[in-house]
Regions:
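Short, well-ordered loop/turn and helix-capping segments at boundaries between secondary-structure elements
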Residues: 113, 212, 216, 297-304, ...
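Flexible, glycine/charged-enriched surface loops at secondary-structure junctions
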Residues: 81-85, 220-225, 272, 303-310, ...
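N-terminal leader/propeptide and maturation segments of large enzyme subunits in energy/redox metabolism
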Residues: 45, 49-60, 65, 217-255, ...
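Extended redox/cofactor-interaction regions of prokaryotic respiratory oxidoreductases
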Residues: 101-169, 174-180, 204-208, 293-395, ...
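Hydrophobic, low-acid, alpha-helix-prone terminal segments
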Residues: 525-528, 532, 538, 542-553, ...
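Active-site phosphate/pyrophosphate-binding segments
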Residues: 210, 228-342, 483-485
Length: 579
């Protein structure tokens, strides 16, 4: 992104026309970013709560007062309840690597605080990729133009992967066919050559059904499977139980369409699959993603330029996280708290202090009522680092104003392409805003942490991150990033097939989890007890199969009764804190 600045003020932003993936285009959110940057409600000074929790009433205080208050409270909390009673809570924020995964992690590790298991977005999918491919990487967007069949599975690329969409458009101009699989008729689905409505939560069944046809008709690449995969015989035995008729009953897709899709996918070269995170946020969603990711290994489509699979490219950014986060600073191993279970943690565990940054848990964490119940505790000391007042800051005892990405030096990784980027501040921070890095650096000094790493500058930490020794980062330095801004990782050379398994082989068979089948909750997951699919549970509660409506979602006339709404067909009230 390019920022035009006159007399110290940004006048407009635009996409970088020289970037090989974004090619000068900004999404609607970022294109309007200056409205956020200069919004009159931006937080500019540290504040202390003066009203009841949840009221959002504060008074302005100095940075010295704010930092001294926080340090004193964290020290006393650690002394009285143990440092594990202190919990950090953060996630993506403005996506800056330093401002989300460096000085903050060092601070909490040195403190001995509880660690946060950041599960809210993509844990199931990421785990699935590691089990299926051995790495969290995939076909790069530039190669989609070479595909002859593009299968978009559970993704609205037109609206949520706007920089990939032009490559798909170009591929179709060259003759590629676009097929979408989604419970919803998205804009992408409406533009596709073929759309298959699938019952929610049945993606695993469809993937196994496709494998049934591919293997049963001998359409798999036997040589590729023999040389590059493990567990084929077990997989072949497993998918025998998923003939098209059974899969059709589960998924709602006609058996004929399942057979035709399997044949077309297996025989069209190159063929590429683009999936997204929505389908892994369901019962057995991780297993569904694992199965889908195995399809290119069956057909050998990884051999082709423009073939393969992509959920995320994030695993290729092999920066030295250990050097940035410094878990070795922990005085002893500490407990891990699942961020998706924050409500339970605040109401059941001995959490006495909560430090929130790069996130708004009162609005985004599952079980919102339980989260708010915890945030209302008078004995809970809450600190929030924010750019604006949010649902979470309303409950905070201390609020600290932070910078935007236009005001930071930071390193930016990606999950949709293979270009690493560094940015310098385009603007000076307004008011008294400070970066996350600077805030935790100052807090470390207040806490008496005298390790040299707490005095590292942003440039020093970027150098540490790039010094992982991984081949993907060979030749990529701070100086080069400073000069070029964006640099492509040393993944497969341009024009050659992308190979995701250089660091590990394909694993295509199901392995029983070592943790006794305990589920990992990711995002807003509806948990059910017996492990069956969502579709079957909806059917059970309705007393029969769900009724399809035009956009491919489920409609159940009797479900309101099951969830406590007595009069079906009459308006029902939905209470929200805002009224």
């Amino acid at each position: 992104m390019l920022v035009h600045v006159e007399d110290g003020k940004a006048t407009r932003v635009e996409g970088d026309p020289d970037h090989p993936v974004t090619r000068g285009f900004l999404c609607g959110k970022v294109a309007q970013y200056l409205e956020r940057e200069y919004h009159p409600e931006r937080l500019l000074h540290p504040m202390r709560r003066i009203g009841a929790k949840g009221e959002g009433r504060f008074e302005k205080i100095s940075w010295d007062t704010a930092l001294d208050t926080i340090a004193a409270r964290l020290k006393s909390t650690a002394e009285q309840h143990g440092a594990e009673s202190i919990l950090p809570y953060s996630y993506g924020g403005n996506m800056g690597f330093l401002n989300g995964s460096s000085m903050d992690r060092r601070f909490f590790h040195r403190l001995g605080a509880s660690r946060l298991d950041r599960t809210i977005c993509a844990t199931a999918g990421a785990t699935a990729l590691m089990e299926a491919l051995g790495t969290k990487t995939g076909t790069e967007p530039e190669q989609f133009v070479d595909a002859k069949l593009i299968l978009v599975w559970g993704a609205n690329v037109h609206g949520t992967s706007v920089h990939l969409w032009p490559f798909i458009v170009e591929a179709r101009r060259r003759g590629a066919k676009l097929i979408t699989i989604d419970p919803v008729l998205t804009k992408t689905a409406a533009l596709a050559d073929q759309h298959l409505f699938i019952n929610p939560g049945t993606d695993l069944a469809l993937a196994l059904g496709l494998m049934h046809v591919i293997i049963g008709e001998g359409l798999h690449d036997a040589d590729y499977v023999a040389r590059h995969t493990a567990g084929f015989d077990e997989l072949a035995e497993l998918v025998r139980g998923y003939p098209p008729e059974r899969v059709s009953a589960l998924t709602g897709i006609a058996a004929e369409d399942i057979v035709n899709l399997a044949r077309e996918y297996a025989t069209t070269r190159p063929a590429v699959i683009r999936a997204n995170y929505g389908l892994q946020r369901s019962e057995r969603g991780g297993r569904a993603m694992q199965a889908i990711a195995c399809l290119p290994a069956l057909t050998g489509s990884w051999k082709d330029v423009g073939g393969g699979f992509c959920l995320s490219t994030s695993g290729a950014f092999a920066v030295d996280r250990a050097a940035l986060e410094r878990i070795d600073l922990e005085p002893h191993p500490t407990r891990l708290v699942n961020m998706s279970l924050l409500g339970e943690a605040l109401t059941e565990l001995d959490i006495q202090a909560l430090v929130v940054y790069n996130s708004n848990p009162a609005a985004v964490a599952p079980n919102a009522n339980r989260v708010r119940q915890g945030l209302l505790r008078e004995d809970l000391f809450t600190v929030a680092l924010e750019q604006f007042a949010t649902d979470t800051t309303d409950y905070a005892d201390i609020v600290l104003p932070v910078t935007t990405f236009l005001e930071n030096t930071d390193l930016y990784l990606a999950y949709g392409h293979y270009h690493i980027q560094m940015a310098r501040p385009a603007l000076e921070a307004p008011g008294e805003c400070k970066s996350n890095v600077e805030i935790f650096r100052l807090l470390a000094a207040r806490m008496g942490f005298d390790e040299a790493c707490f005095r590292d500058t942003e440039d020093e930490m970027i150098r540490q991150a790039l010094a992982s020794g991984h081949a993907y980062l060979d030749g990529i330095s701070l100086e080069r990033l400073d000069q070029e801004g964006s640099v492509r990782l040393n993944v497969s050379p341009t024009g050659e097939p992308f190979q995701p398994f250089a660091q590990g082989g394909f694993q295509v068979t199901h392995r029983q989890p070592a943790h006794n089948g305990k589920r990992v909750q990711v995002g807003r997951v509806h948990r059910v007890g017996d492990g069956r699919g969502i579709a079957e549970h909806v059917a059970d509660r309705c007393g029969g199969p769900g009724q399809r409506i035009s956009d491919g979602l489920w409609h159940c006339r009797t479900l309101p009764v099951a969830v406590g709404v007595a009069d079906v067909g009459r308006p029902a009230g939905l209470d929200m804190p805002e009224g």
